[in-house]
Amino acid sequence: FLYLRDTYPGLLCRREDIGAHKDLMIHTLRYGLISALQASSLYIGKILVQGSVNTLGTPGIAAYTAATRIEGFANSFGDSGGSAISVMVSQNLGAGNHDRVKKSLKWGMLLNWTVGIIVSLLMFIGSDQALRLFLGSSDELALHYGNGYIRLISLFYIFCFTGSAYMGYFKGRGHMLLAFFGTTGHILLRAALSALWIGKMGLSAVAVATGIGWMLCVTYLTINYVRIYLT
């Protein structure tokens, strides 16, 4: 303390340094509330989808539960890429390096695409081996459902990773509402289409509905990116 006081007094926290920044508190509260709503809508949608899956009986439920565990691991790569883009965009935007903001999305998107393609191939090729880690080898019907689901949804994963990159970009720029509307639109469409199609298509309905939801979300975010880029 004495060393800092004599050498670097600016590093010490004084009573006059403590206070409330009203505008900053409002911004923080607004971002936090929107992020909470986004997360809530995502998990409410997952509950609705689970309700549709429950109509398939025990094999369908077991297959979907195992498949979502595999998806959770796969999605972590896209989410990490989106978080990295968010940090890069916000830091460069704050520093006034607008050219690097665009490059952050460009290279982050390319990285997400590369990882997304690799993840898709691994899911498609190795779905059976991965599912057997969570399902018994004797549960052939659940394995059949799970393999069909994983292989079908892996074809759409490029849209999932693209959406994650866009989400990171918009969050980094502070456009939290765009991220919220994109997520909410995706999950509502996913839940609605799953409920409509699951009686005829089985678990594949959830995979197709999820893929269409990702495509809608990416289309919405791309339109808004072009709008912001042009202005």
Residue ranges and their predicted role:
Residues 17-48, 52-53, 69, 73, ...:
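Hydrophobic faces of transmembrane alpha-helices in multi-pass small-molecule transporters and flippases
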Residues 1, 79-82, 153-172, 178-190, ...:
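Short runs within selected transmembrane alpha-helices of multi-pass transporters and secretion channels
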Residues 1-33, 89-155, 197-231:
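Short alpha-helical transmembrane segments in multi-pass integral membrane proteins
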Residues 41, 45, 49, 53, ...:
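Alpha-helical membrane-inserting segments
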Residues 40-73, 91-92, 129-140, 196, ...:
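Helix-terminus/linker motif at the lipid-water interface of multi-pass membrane proteins
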Residues 35, 39, 47, 51, ...:
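Transmembrane alpha-helix boundary and packing residues in multipass membrane permease domains
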